[in-house]
UniProtKB/Swiss-Prot annotation:
NCBIfam families: plsB, PRK04974.1. The gene is plsB. One of its GO terms (biological process) is fatty acid metabolic process. SUPFAM superfamilies: Glycerol-3-phosphate (1)-acyltransferase. Pathway: Phospholipid metabolism; CDP-diacylglycerol biosynthesis; CDP-diacylglycerol from sn-glycerol 3-phosphate: step 1/3. Pfam families: Acyltransferase, GPAT_C. It comes from the Bacteria. One of its GO terms (cellular component) is plasma membrane. This is Glycerol-3-phosphate acyltransferase. It catalyses: sn-glycerol 3-phosphate + an acyl-CoA = a 1-acyl-sn-glycero-3-phosphate + CoA. The HXXXXD motif is essential for acyltransferase activity and may constitute the binding site for the phosphate moiety of the glycerol-3-phosphate. It is a peripheral membrane protein. The keyword Transferase applies.
Length: 813
């Protein structure tokens, strides 16, 4: 029998080797599932299938995992390295998979009772031939059990979409230690494995796709929708039937029309696109999401928004991580022919930019979103509302988050978890367009021709990054911060609600920044922009890159960030090898200079701003020490403590105030270790041989501190100034400063940044109850700021503020 079985397997191996692509999930099971390959492994498959076993073996060999065809040899006993839980459609009949498996498990368990060092790892594995969830009106897909003919067809049709899913290993040592005397333990192990397979199947395929019209009919019968239709008919003096047709038209505009075949085409197309544009996509912490999916959570992906391709990239990554691509909230501006129809088939549902005052639309959209949650579909939306033109996170728009919390409040049975996602690129497709818009050009309307023109002229754009941040399970978060949420009625909008929406939205942004991906472009751009001439010698640039890397490794911002491991020379060579970066190499008698072209300076600020929050605190410390030359450490700590609340609000930083002092101590220790500063008892001073590196570090805070001083100086001159006027004058002076001193950062005179700073001043007690500025507190901040800003900039700000105040006095006379 074994000879025939081996012949059969060898016969299967040849066609499967080219029909079926290796798609293991996760990509590195040894690391992600913490498998110990020094200990025996037993693979558990759900059904008897030699085809599945051959595909498993192919993947195991490519991953460096033990060969399932070879037996485990333990203390003189020979036991199989794989088992099947149930019978399948098979050519070679067995004595009964269930009994054989229980017997194998029993033998392994007995070995554990006699060998204290043994720990066999039981790894459930399923082979997914295609990932179609089926449709509500067409019954269940044949995912569970395929006969020989069906599997042949599956190998031909779905071979490139076959995934081998490895689950978390079960430790037999743990089972024996916990349940050693249980005679039925060998029977319990298969049952536990079956539970894994059931969860795997749901997390990989998701719920069945809806019958769109049936969903519309259900939504149109919802009491809230019926009331909105009635109000629409009454308010616009039309019949209820006409109002109902209008409601159905709106639903048709909103709703996705997901099609699995279309998703498969998208996978091929996007795979080609990433290979054309980028050198690879780095994905981190996807295990968090897989864990949530296996635990049955309703998952809401909330990525930062850099580019239109964010939609596509995240769905592509999730599909290849063994997860269901989500329903994506896309702006109505993307609903143009033919892209809108294509995106809709890939899971996009469309949302208008504003629907304030349109009760029928808002009700239908809210109920549609609630229905997606109720049916168990994962959802994705961009909380910033639009793409960031500056590379910084934008202030969150809370409408979608409000609807998400309403779904929880109205009795959503499954736990809802928000998954913040950091999406980063070494080159953003639209960055040239962003630069034009920031210089005042009108926003170009999206169309198919524009998209194709952008893609056609771009290639060799470096790497892309998708990093899944720390999830926020809403019920857990609300229990901790808003415990009263459970005591309110479902249909009410209680007092805690708006505060909770704002708090969760901000926490999402904080967690996105905690998952930042540092790359060669970020670091190189930060260093070059720190030089006033946007040029450095190659040696100085490499030294600065190494300093950044060492800091990020030794004083990590968070456990979630991605830090490049390549040496500085490789990072720089990588950036120089990319297209359209605007970095030139020039040679003189002293060696090579690396220079950033002037017209690319604004573009490079985009990439610097992606990681500015990671480097802002050491930049502040460096700036304080540099401008004082020698200063007491306690004064440095006090200065940082005064400025940190404003940095925290502006840059969505996560460090709580009570942990700040310890963090600054670590920063000082690292700067001292790098010999950038001297530390003599309680005195910090500059180390002159390394002063250039310290100057480049300090430049990372230069523009932020200048902005703060502009607003503080205006308030000191006119403590009773209105908030609107304060924002306007701050912006005007910043624009003047940027022209006079060649400041290229587009966010330098962004009104929203000044608005955030002014709101933070209010939150931190810099205004009295009458709305007037507290001059004494502001003067204390001004003293800090004036000491870390050059005399030239100080004089320009002072002169501009005095001129603005004089003009106001003339206008008021």
């Amino acid at each position: 029998m074994s000879a025939f079985l081996n012949l059969y397997r060898n016969t299967l191996s040849w066609p499967l080797s080219f029909l079926v692509k290796d798609n293991p999930i996760p990509n590195n099971p040894v690391e992600e599932l913490t498998l110990n390959i020094e200990q025996p492994i037993v693979y558990v498959l759900p059904y008897t299938s030699q085809t599945d076993l051959v595909v498993l073996r192919k993947n195991c060999l490519s991953l460096g995992l033990p060969d399932p065809f070879l037996d485990n040899r333990i203390e003189g006993k020979v036991l199989p390295r794989y088992v099947f839980l149930d019978e399948g459609h098979q050519f070679f009949k067995s004595k009964g998979a269930k009994k054989e498996t229980e017997k194998v498990f029993k033998n392994y368990l007995e070995l554990h009772r006699t060998s204290a060092d043994l720990d066999v790892q039981v790894v459930p594995v399923s082979v997914l031939w295609g990932r179609s969830p089926g449709r509500e009106d067409k019954g269940l897909p044949k995912l569970r059990l395929l006969n020989g003919l069906q599997k042949t067809i599956a190998a031909i049709w779905f071979g490139r979409d076959t995934f081998v899913r490895f689950s978390q290993a079960m430790s037999m040592r743990y089972m024996v230690n916990e349940y050693g005397e249980d005679e039925k333990l060998a029977q319990k192990l298969p049952r536990i494995a079956k539970m894994h397979f059931a969860k795997q199947r749901i997390s990989a395929t998701g719920p069945r796709l809806p019958n769109r019209q049936a969903m519309f009919n259900k939504l149109l019968q919802h009491p809230a929708v019926l009331q909105a239709i009635e109000d629409e008919a009454r308010g616009k003096n039309m019949t209820k039937e006409k109002a109902r047709k209008e409601a159905e038209k709106i639903l048709n505009e909103i709703a996705a029309d997901t099609n699995y075949s279309s998703l498969r085409v998208a996978d091929r197309l996007l795979g080609w696109l990433w290979n054309k544009l980028y050198q690879g996509i780095e994905v981190e912490h996807a295990d968090r999401v897989r864990r949530l999916a296996l635990e049955g959570h309703e998952i809401v992906y909330v990525p930062c928004h850099r580019s239109h391709i964010d939609y596509l990239l995240l769905s592509y990554v999730l599909y290849h991580q063994g997860l269901v691509p989500p329903h994506i909230a896309a702006g109505i501006n993307l609903n143009f022919w033919p892209v809108g129809r294509i995106f809709r088939s890939w899971g996009a549902f469309f949302i208008r930019r504003t629907f304030k005052g349109n009760r029928l639309y808002s009700t239908l959209f809210r109920e549609y979103l609630g229905e997606l949650f109720h049916r168990g579909y994962s959802v994705e939306y961009f909380i910033e509302g639009g793409r960031s033109r500056t590379g910084r996170l934008l202030t969150p728009k809370t409408g979608m988050m409000s609807m998400t919390l309403q779904a929880l409040q109205q009795g959503q049975t499954r736990p809802i978890s928000i998954v913040p996602v950091y999406v980063g690129y070494e080159h953003v497709l639209e960055v040239d367009t962003y630069a034009k818009e920031l210089r005042g050009a009108a926003k170009e309307k999206e169309n198919a021709g524009l998209v194709l023109r952008v893609i056609k002229k771009l290639r060799n754009l470096g790497r892309g990054f998708v990093n899944f941040g720390e999830p926020i399970t809403l019920s857990t978060y609300l229990n901790r911060h808003f415990p009263e949420w459970k005591n309110e009625g479902r249909d009410e909008r209680p007092l805690w609600f708006n505060k909770a929406v704002d708090a969760v939205s901000r926490q999402v942004m904080v967690n996105i920044n905690k998952a930042a991906a540092v790359n060669a472009m970020n670091l190189t751009g930060t260093a070059l922009l720190s030089s006033r001439q946007r040029a450095l010698s190659r040696e100085q640039l490499l030294e600065q890159l190494e300093s950044y890397q060492q800091y990020l490794l030794n004083v990590s911002y968070s456990d979630d960030i991605i830090i490049p491991s390549a040496p500085p020379k490789e990072l720089l060579d990588h950036v120089l090898g990319l297209d359209r970066v605007g970095i030139l190499i020039e040679k003189d008698n002293f060696g090579e200079l690396v220079r950033l072209e002037r017209n690319h300076a604004v573009l490079m600020t985009y990439y610097r701003n992606n990681i500015q929050h990671l480097l802002v605190l050491p930049s502040l410390v460096a700036s304080i020490v540099l401008h004082h030359e020698a200063i007491q450490k306690d004064l440095v700590l006090t200065s940082v403590e005064k400025l940190y609340p404003f940095l925290k609000a502006e840059l969505f930083m996560h460090l709580p105030p009570e942990a700040l002092r310890e963090k600054v101590e670590r920063i000082i220790a690292e700067l001292h270790r790098q010999q950038l500063i001297k530390l003599n008892e309680n005195i910090l001073s500059i180390n002159r041989p390394r002063v250039r590196t310290l100057q480049l570090w300090s430049a990372g805070m230069r523009e932020i501190l200048q902005r703060y001083l502009i607003t503080v100086a205006i308030l000191l001159q006119d403590p009773a100034i209105s908030r609107g006027k304060l924002e306007k004058e701050s912006q005007s002076i910043a624009q003047r400063l940027s022209v006079l001193h060649g400041i290229n950062s587009p966010e330098f005179f962004d009104k929203a940044v000044f608005s955030t700073f002014i709101a933070s001043l209010k939150d931190n007690g810099y205004f009295d109850t009458s709305g007037n500025a507290d001059v004494t507190k502001l003067q204390g901040m001004a003293d800090i700021l004036e000491h870390v800003i050059s005399t030239e900039i100080n004089l320009t700000i002072k002169s501009a503020v005095e001129t603005a105040v004089d003009l106001d006095e003339i206008e008021s006379e």
